[in-house]
């Protein structure tokens, strides 16, 4: 009799698993029973179960002991007990990678595979293929072909699925079984047809034409298996994406025709495929949306869930296409399945009108406590999208978010809410104080370090700009008193930012920082001491440079440069300008934390794209004296069409006095090899080409890189914009495409490329200034210049802002790239660093009448960057 456990034991798992406390040595000792005569099937099957359990629990079996157990197990083939035989097949598959000489069972498996007992044949095929390698496969090829076309569906399916696994190691052999697979694909059995279709596709998937023919054949003659239809829909949609085909394609017609299939599975798969096709218009989505609308009223919960989840996805890009389903979605809000109700609500939030928000919020709040954190995050994301769509509703949405914030929940859920509140604060200045107050209350009882430090950073950034900044000090200082060291350090930094921006509060802040100097933690003490000394100087420039804006360099780059400096001692002081600049704000230069516990950081920080380029260029002897790399263009520029015989892409690398053009070349002609490849450049301005670094050899389809080194203008340093004409020159040597043999003699040839533009943006690296006003004061007005321009071809402020940001290649600060609605004036604030490490700031005041008038004020620590900005705009 089995012992009856109560519910508590069941839930805890205590005592409910009879195999829980197995010992490997004892089980292997028991395996000697396999050698006894007569065989006891029940006892042997139980021992095999124990062995399988140990393996699946991760227990390590040594090669010798596994081999001994495996050889003993082979004697069990003498028994005809069906249960024991099936257990043998399972054990063979599990131990095939552990034991040695497993091929000893090949003859036994082949015998079962070709025998009369259908229950043995399918599992025997699977086990045989598991132990067969590429060298043995040809010996059983005949049996596999027979099994694929076998009349017994389980045998045929086993052979087809096993063939699919064998493709990875023996593609050429399995490819010869295509005729048998095609015969199996016409089977009446739904699983056989599905598996056969899968094998055919994977054999042909690298041949686009063969895949197209296969789709055409099976869509024309029809399929019996709904699984096969689903497979064909996925293949067709993938083919459509790769071909970037129009919606007039037969493939799209096939997918659309599946919306009328009698199987619900196929109908949903077709609707899902259409919805996920890139660039689908609302008109093309309409049939799929209609089908999903019908599924919303299905009695099957799975169908309702699938429909509403897919509609939710459609609503992100095409909310108007889902509006017709609003009535059905509203009916699902009261669905007994909370997952369906949540998705229905979030979909309605994306498609509903402003007037329906209050009602929807009430409905959501009625069951928020009953759904999982995963779905709560979905709700928060929908509310975030709603905030951007209807900014006037921020008060209602903010209150709802704060109510959610006070409830129990995991890290991801709370982070989603905090992200949403912060985005509302940034998008809507009216909601700033309300949002900050809610966040202050949250950190009073916040168990997540990452969120607490992030909110403290936000308070230090936004709090001093509010009408009553002193009210936040109590919340921040409470963190110094009550929290652990990471949060205390964040609180000290936040306090310092209040002192740096508010002279009235400075004495109080200094008192608080003096208390922090005695903290137990080094980091907290060091921060407090540093900020205290800076603030006591009462200099705006120091406050801006060391407290409000801080470093604009790459943290991994700084770490690497400092390590290099300590390894190679020098009399010269460490030059911060030798460190690559940060392309993201400092707070984002860390891995995303996904738990509340301290996450172990990787020992080595992954190199950035610019650091990789720096190392590659430093390895070229011609570039040794160029100094540190200032900037690399974010995206390579294509100088040829993608379908031409040579594919050339250029990346521009900017140094303090030079430009290096990196040309990544690919030869797409299989009957030619190119040698000594260079790209000759002719500038239109005062640039001077200094040298070329060729690609010595460029065989077929093997990328190579050549470089051109150019000196920047010296006579007129403001003339940084330039157009280069480019010609690729090389020696052609013919080669045999089959053998790869190259002719000894070649001939000179050239290939004209597209012109290459160098703009002012190539000389400026964008940097983020959290506090633009402080940075503006820090740079000073010694080299300030101002000019007014008319943008005659631009008709909107949004277009003007976008063009200016793109043209200058600078970072918009304080969200000034967002133009408020119904305004005819706007101020754009831009920050960057000019090559050589000189800060450059631009304040652009825009006025919209008939055209846009722009007043540009530029400041820098040197005169040249200011002159270049104004000259380039003019």
Curated annotation (Swiss-Prot):
Entry-annotated residues carrying Phosphothreonine: 594
One GO BP annotation of this record: endoplasmic reticulum to Golgi vesicle-mediated transport
GO cellular component: COPI vesicle coat; cytosol; endoplasmic reticulum; endoplasmic reticulum-Golgi intermediate compartment; Golgi membrane
Subcellular location as annotated: Cytoplasm, Cytosol; Golgi apparatus membrane; Cytoplasmic vesicle, COPI-coated vesicle membrane
Residue ranges, annotated region (Disordered): 1-21
GO MF term set: structural molecule activity
HEAT repeats: 64-101, 283-320, 322-355, 356-392
Chain segments annotated as coiled-coil in the UniProt record: none
Name this protein carries in UniProt: Coatomer subunit gamma-1
Gene (UniProt): Copg1
